UniProtKB/Swiss-Prot annotation:
GO terms for molecular function: nucleotide binding. Keywords: Nucleotide-binding. This is Nucleotide-binding protein Neut_0623. The keyword Phosphoprotein does not apply. Nucleotide-binding protein. One of its GO terms (cellular component) is cytosol. The keyword Acetylation does not apply. Belongs to the YajQ family.
Length: 161
């Protein structure tokens, strides 16, 4: 029986490259001269630092541009609250969402079941596995999920015949 997995993954090395490019650009830009604006990464968490909220917004815009240039979908970014740290400086935590969360996985399974296609969808941790009798039906499911789910970037992996 043919099957495939629906996942949401982000390449950690591409995130690191985007953050490095952001830090290079911020250090070279004239409007950030003398500023302590920067970005730091720990696994799938990013921390943006700046002198004030306006500059933090500019750093965020640069981050989005660098992610887009490296073909990382910005829908996977979960922005936290802006926190004040020593003096006027501000910090913002950004989490990069990976894996299909259980609520979204249930929504995907419900979408597939409501379509009345002859496939079985099951949730396996942070992956949704779809199994069907024919490849054509599985390709219809891929198109259905691509059109119906827009909250998170999804990839279709592990296609087996």
């Amino acid at each position: 029986m043919p099957s495939f997995d629906i996942v949401s993954e982000v390449d950690k090395q591409e995130i690191r490259n985007a953050v490095d490019q952001l830090n290079k650009e911020v250090s070279a830009r004239f409007d950030f001269k003398g500023s302590d604006a920067r970005a730091e990464q720990t696994d799938y968490e990013l921390y943006l630092f700046a002198d004030d909220e306006f500059k933090l917004g500019q750093v965020m815009d640069i981050l989005i541009a660098k992610f887009t240039k490296r073909e990382i979908d910005v829908r996977c970014l979960d922005k936290g609250q802006v926190e004040k740290i020593s003096g006027n400086k501000v910090k913002q935590k950004i989490t990069v969402k990976t894996g299909v969360e259980s609520d979204l996985a249930r929504k995907i399974v419900k979408l597939i079941k409501d379509s009345k296609l002859k496939v079985q969808a099951s949730i396996q941790g942070e992956v949704v596995r779809v199994t069907g009798a024919k490849r054509d039906v599985l390709q219809e499911v891929i198109q259905l999920v691509k059109g119906g789910i827009t909250e998170l970037p999804l990839q279709f992996r592990n296609f087996r015949d």
